[in-house]
Amino acid sequence: MDPLPRRASLQNTGNVGEGWVRQYLCQQGWQILAQRWRCPWGELDLVAHKADVLIFVEVKTRSPGSWDRGGLLAVGIPKQRRLIRAAQAFLSQHPHLSELSCRFDVALIERRASREGVSYALVDYLPAAFEIC
């Protein structure tokens, strides 16, 4: 069987990472409202709600030793601005959620390949990873 094209393989890796974070959040009592929510300004990987808090979670799945410190450097100012605009679009479509306290979290997932196969691990979860300016 032919290997997946690189883009499809990376997309699948990202989807698996999002699944791990989704499971983690559910175990923490969060209700997932959306996954891979898209708008003209970008995509929100996960949107979740618990009590009076709404979180927008950016998930980065990387192999060990990645150039961007496990995905953390990929969430720079331009990416943060896109996430904020996407969150504003999400809230405009879900006005009943606009009174909740909102925050932006970042989840870092590590993908490890070995002879036994591929495994994933949540390396770090950063609540309120950046401020809304």
UniProtKB/Swiss-Prot annotation:
Family annotation (InterPro entries): Restrct_endonuc-II-like, tRNA_endonuc-like_dom_sf, UPF0102_YraN-like
Domain of life assignment: Bacteria
GO MF terms, alphabetically ordered: nucleic acid binding
Family that this chain belongs to: Belongs to the UPF0102 family.
Name of the protein in question: UPF0102 protein CYB_2119
Organism whose genome encodes this protein: Synechococcus sp. (strain JA-2-3B'a(2-13)) (Cyanobacteria bacterium Yellowstone B-Prime)
